[in-house]
Amino acid sequence: MNASSERDRSLFGVLRQFRRSFWSVGIFSAVINVLMLAPSVYMLQVYDRVLASGNGITLLMLTLLMAGLCAFMGALEWVRSLLVVRLGTRIDLALNQDVFNAAFARNLEAGDGRAGLALTDLTLLRQFITGNALFAFFDVPWFPLFLLVLFLLHPWLGMLALGGTVVPGGVGLAEPASDQSTAGGSNQQSQQATHLADAQLRNADVIEAMGMLGNLRRRWLARHYRFISLQNLASERAAAVGGASKYSRIALQSLMLGLGALLAIDGKITPGMMIAGSILVGRVLSPIDQLIGVWKQWSSARIAWQRLTRLIAAYPPRPAAMALPAPEGHLSVEQVSLRTAQGNTRLQNIHFSLQAGETLVILGASGSGKSSLARLLVGAQSPTQGKVRLDGADLNQVDKNTFGPTIGYLPQDVQLFKGSLAENIARFGDADPEKVVAAAKLAGVHELILSLPNGYDTELGDGGGGLSGGQRQRIGLARAMYGDPCLLILDEPNASLDSEGDQALMQAIVALQKRGATVVLITHRPALTTLAQKILILHEGQQQRMGLARDVLTELQQRSAANQARMNPTAAMPQ
C-alpha cells in the first residue's frame, strides 16, 4: 500500500475522530427539521378549527404551544451552532501541526513561497465546517419529509412541489459544477497576480532607479486582466442562476396558493391545508436554496481538502527520533549527489570528512554547487544519493529540535525575521541575555547593536527591514554562533561586509577554532583560506580537489603560474 493512500486514510481518520460530534449535529438537525412542521400544523389548526369554532381559548393554547416550540427550536439552533464552531476548532487543532510542518517541508524543498496556501486551505476548511455550508448538508436530507407531507395533503400539491424543485435545483447545482473550472482558473490567476506583485514590488529601489515600473506593471496587468475576465464570467453565470432561482421560488409559492385555492373550491382540501401547503413548499425549497448557495463553498473546500491530502501525503510527519547526545562536530559526507526535480545534477559524488575543530574552505566558481552543498551540510535539504553525518548520525533522520541548536548556519542570502534583535539572535527560543551578548560580541556586532535606539530590543521588520545588508549579515553571523554550536556552515560570510566587518569575521572564526568548533567556509575571497586546515574545490557540481590547505594552495599557485606562462611565454624567457 502506498504512502498516499495511507495518508488519505489518516486525513479522513481525523474526521472519524469527531464522528460523535457529527452525529450530535445530525441529531440536532433532525429534531430542528421535524419541529419545522410546527408552523404548518399551527396554521392548519387555526384556519380549520379555530376560525370554524370561534374558540379563543383554543387559539391561545395553540399560540402558546407554538411560541414554546419556536423558543425550543431557537435553543437547538444555538446549541448546534456552538457544536460546529467547536468542531471546526478541534479539527483545526488536530491538523494544523501536520499541515504547518508539511508546508514548511515543501517550501524547504521547492522554495516556491507557497507555504501560506496550505494554511489558507486549512482556514477554508474550518470556515466551511463552522459556516452555513455544514448546516445545509445536514438539512437537505430532510426536504423529502416536507415533500411527503405535501403529498399527504393532496397528490397534486406534492407533484407541483416536486416539479418546482427539480428544475431550479437541477439548474442551480449543475451551474456551479460547470463553472468550477472558471472559478478555479479565476482563483489561480488571482494568486499568481498577487504573488507576482509581491515579488516585484519587494525590490522597489531597483524598479524606481532603472525605470522598470511600467514593464513590470504590464506583466502584472496581463494576469490581473485574465483574473478579472474569468471572475466576471463566473459572476455573470452566478447572477443568472441566482435570479432564476429567486423568481422561480416566488412563482412556485404563488402557484401553490393558486392550486390550493382551486382544490379548496372543489372541496378536495380545506383552506387550512391550502395555507399549510404554501408554508411547506417554502420548507421544501429552503434546503435546496441553501445547498445552491453553499455549493461553491463546498467545491472550494473539496479542492482545499484534496490539496492538503496531497501535501501531507508527499510530506508526511516525521517519526519521533530517539534523542542523541550532543554532537562534538565530526562531519562526514559520504558519496553525496543532488539532483533537481527536473533531473539536473547539482552535485555528484562529493565525499570528505572533517574532525571536530577542523576548518574547511570550499572554493568554486558561481554555479558550481557550493550553496547547494551548504544546504546539505546543515540538513536543510536531503541528498538524492549518499549521506551527510554529524558524529555518525544522518542529519536527515535526527531530531532537528535536538541537533538544530548545535548547528550554526549563515546562508548566502541572510533573512532575519520580524521581532527584536535579541529574539533573532536567540533563534526565537528562550533568549538567554548572556548567550545573546556573547554571540553578538563573538560576531563583532555588539557595539553596533548598542548604537541602535533600543539596542537589543530594536524591532526589525520583515526580512530584517531597517538594517543594511552588511548589518543583516553580521546579525545573521551572531545568530549562527548563538549557543556555542559545534558545527558552523558559513556561506559567503563576508559578501556584504566592509573592512571592519571582515576583520571581525576573521577574529570570530579564530575564536571558534579555539573553542573546538568545526567550521565550513564557502567563499571566493582568498583571505579566508589562511584560516583553513583543508580546502575543497568544486567545479560544475563535482569534487575537483580535496586536501590539506597547504597542498591545495601550492597546487593552485603552480597551476596559476603555468597558466600565466602559457599566456605570456616571453615573460618566462631568460633576459
Swiss-Prot record:
Annotated coiled-coil segments of the chain: none
Keywords: ATP-binding, Cell inner membrane, Cell membrane, Membrane, Nucleotide-binding, Transmembrane, Transmembrane helix, Transport
GO MF annotation terms: ABC-type oligopeptide transporter activity; ATP binding; ATP hydrolysis activity
Sequence positions that bind ATP: 364-371
Main location: membrane
InterPro entries: AAA+_ATPase, ABC1_TM_dom, ABC1_TM_sf, ABC_transporter-like_ATP-bd, ABC_transporter-like_CS, ATPase_T1SS_PrtD-like, P-loop_NTPase, Type_1_exporter
GO CC entries: plasma membrane; type I protein secretion system complex
Ranges where the ABC transporter domain occurs: 331-565
Residues annotated as domain ABC transmembrane type-1: 22-300
An annotated GO BP: protein secretion by the type I secretion system
Keyword Transmembrane helix applies: yes
PROSITE patterns: ABC_TM1F, ABC_TRANSPORTER_1, ABC_TRANSPORTER_2
Membrane topology: Multi-pass membrane protein
Gene3D superfamilies: ABC transporter type 1, transmembrane domain, P-loop containing nucleotide triphosphate hydrolases
Pfam families to which the protein is assigned, alphabetical: ABC_membrane (PF00664), ABC_tran (PF00005)
Protein origin, superkingdom: Bacteria
Transmembrane annotation, as ranges: 22-42, 56-76, 133-153, 154-174, 255-275
Localization terms from the record: Cell inner membrane
SMART domains: AAA
Main function: Involved in the secretion of proteases A, B, C and G.
Assigned protein family: Belongs to the ABC transporter superfamily.
Protein name, per record: Proteases secretion ATP-binding protein PrtD
Species of origin: Dickeya chrysanthemi
Gene: prtD
